[in-house]
């Protein structure tokens, strides 16, 4: 057998099938496109469903690929077994109605055994087939010549990944030899059994059926071939590696982790698990973030968050207690650069996202673990083995512990978690969120007469804001009527309308519909269930009848402000990509007459300097007086032009393309200015985070921007008046006041230190001696934890050799600090353990180093009793 690198194996596979007339399909993004049945691309065939189910005919019916994939159904096993992964590569060859079983089997055998290619010893290969697949059995037996004892019929040889193609399959196994198993009594020691000797290297699926969304199976238009070879497993065989992790796909990551941790891979099972978890999870996170997924509390983002936090948890067992995963991104990029250049191209961005997520978790990890430890001890004391759903939810909601992470920590302590209770708490949170949201009168809940209205209505509002028309339908309280009187609310549909209906983030128009003395003030416009523009308003005068001729007019001032904000939103979207990076994508928007709001994907806060750059770029495009061109185009042509489409948005064959010069091009159905100069001015008023990986910018344009800047100038003038200076001197005046304040604070701290030293001197008289160990455990007056730690340090210096624990009450909360001198640390005394015991005795928790530690408590009335427990603790150490 040849010695090959993973990159050589991957390329060799593609080259082989290229020689067999296959087109090489590029690896698709891990984020599925138009496939709601999948969270991630989880196989090579998952990206080719459109070909297999007959929706699209490929240019070449023979296809091969190397497809990056993610599966998360058994994360808890990753790191603990030889071959479980969350990220992996699947090599595959596919036939869309071209060749079938005979060629698939012959070529698989050729690739594996021919010396030009992999060059396996044929005697080491066995195969499995479905019990009813006699054709495959005969091909292996008679065409290839495999002895019957190495052809095993297995009931499980039927491949099904959910919605999509499926059918019987045959698997090829490599015998690694007796070193990996030689017990004839082992019931699993056979190709297809659970063992390490016979490794599956290739799965050939004879795809004949489509698994429909309703669970039924129907014959595919043509018989197809779908094969899958796991690159990691294949490489482990070729490189004679004990596990997949001992190959060149993982070892550089493990070596880098060794350098960070100071620990060695291969010294213990526990440490090896940690190294494997880190190596697997950084591959997944790097590729997922590179493809546009960001850490969050739901969907794909939750998977990334869970994996990174699981890696942090395991890294602690190899002495890594700081953010470090981001340092491994360049290692992953180098390993995969030959075929997946995207990780190397986006390495800085990926590392920044991962570092931000790690830092966020480390901020709460220590406190969360203390709470979890407290919960576990509390339940154990009660004789319980289950952590309540309420406690699991608190750790999830407050400290960012994915429930699966809590479960793993609990498992280490012989505990379980209450999943049902956790889900109940999650449901309560979702309900609270639903109740907190404003009722926006969603069209989805409207029914009755509206659903049955099929009357046609033409929208002319792109070009006209006023028109003569007729009232086609009248509704009141959801029912069709013929007449609505003055003072009553009304809904109506016009034969043609200039009023824009709320969609794409743009609000509906306001205005008037009049006929003689009768008038309706239009307050909102939405789309009815069958697509007509449904106007809502109040009859301000006269009576409105169905069929009457009316004049419909949009309020021009409001429409003009709306279009300014909408075009500015497009400019903002592109400016964000220019300044922050191409990873930025729209996550939501709101365009009103008074302001615009734009939500976008980004991993961290946008800096002041970045906001200034973004604002400047938008204004430069406004002042450049760029024409805005709007065209209807076939969607393929629009995308070829580079038009940005909203992820998940459904588009027809013909789309509306809004183009601002050569700067911005988007698919959009909204209303826009004709030239950017009409916008006048753009001003960002706020930037904030609205969820993990999602930021929000609010901005104003035109007159609104002018008023915003005037309001800020007025505030500055008021500040100058209060500071008794002019506007230009305000910063200097504030700096002078800050300097005076710092001087006063230093003087105050000096006085407090003197008082603290005085108190510290007084409590020296309260030192106890226990079998030669000096102990000082007292309640003191300290303004905060820093003050308390300073007192402990001073007392350690004065006493020379002592165990010290001090407590103070501030705003009904307890602060505790403990210190142990170096000589007593060597005798087994540990400040972190002492402070933990004292804190738990007054309803809190904490910890720290052997020489210095701190904690908090919630029951100030028990502080004296808690401090008294220090004496027993000292005796227990002795």
Swiss-Prot record:
Spell out the InterPro entries in the cross-references: aa-tRNA-synth_II/BPL/LPL, Ala-tRNA-lgiase_IIc, Ala-tRNA-ligase_IIc_anticod-bd, Ala-tRNA-synth_IIc_core, Ala-tRNA-synth_IIc_N, Ala-tRNA_ligase, Ala_tRNA_ligase_euk/bac, DHHA1_dom
Top-level EC class: ligase
Give any single GO term for biological process. alanyl-tRNA aminoacylation
Q: What superkingdom heads the lineage?
A: Bacteria
Could you list the residue ranges that cross the membrane?
A: none
Q: Where in the cell is it found?
A: Cytoplasm
Cofactor binding: number and manner = Binds 1 zinc ion per subunit.
Q: Spell out the molecular function terms from Gene Ontology.
A: alanine-tRNA ligase activity; aminoacyl-tRNA deacylase activity; ATP binding; catalytic activity, acting on a protein; transferase activity; tRNA binding; zinc ion binding
One Pfam match: tRNA_SAD
Q: Which reaction does it catalyse?
A: tRNA(Ala) + L-alanine + ATP = L-alanyl-tRNA(Ala) + AMP + diphosphate
GO CC terms for this protein? cytosol
> What cofactors does the UniProt entry give for this protein?
Zn(2+)
Q: Which residues bind Zn(2+)?
A: 566, 570, 668, 672
Q: Give the EC number(s) under which this enzyme is classified.
A: 6.1.1.7
Keyword annotations: Aminoacyl-tRNA synthetase, ATP-binding, Cytoplasm, Ligase, Metal-binding, Nucleotide-binding, Protein biosynthesis, RNA-binding, tRNA-binding, Zinc
Briefly state the protein's biological role.
Answer: Catalyzes the attachment of alanine to tRNA(Ala) in a two-step reaction: alanine is first activated by ATP to form Ala-AMP and then transferred to the acceptor end of tRNA(Ala). Also edits incorrectly charged Ser-tRNA(Ala) and Gly-tRNA(Ala) via its editing domain.
Family named by the database record: Belongs to the class-II aminoacyl-tRNA synthetase family.
Free-text note regarding domains: Consists of three domains; the N-terminal catalytic domain, the editing domain and the C-terminal C-Ala domain. The editing domain removes incorrectly charged amino acids, while the C-Ala domain, along with tRNA(Ala), serves as a bridge to cooperatively bring together the editing and aminoacylation centers thus stimulating deacylation of misacylated tRNAs.
Kindly provide the name given to this protein in its UniProt entry.
Answer: Alanine--tRNA ligase
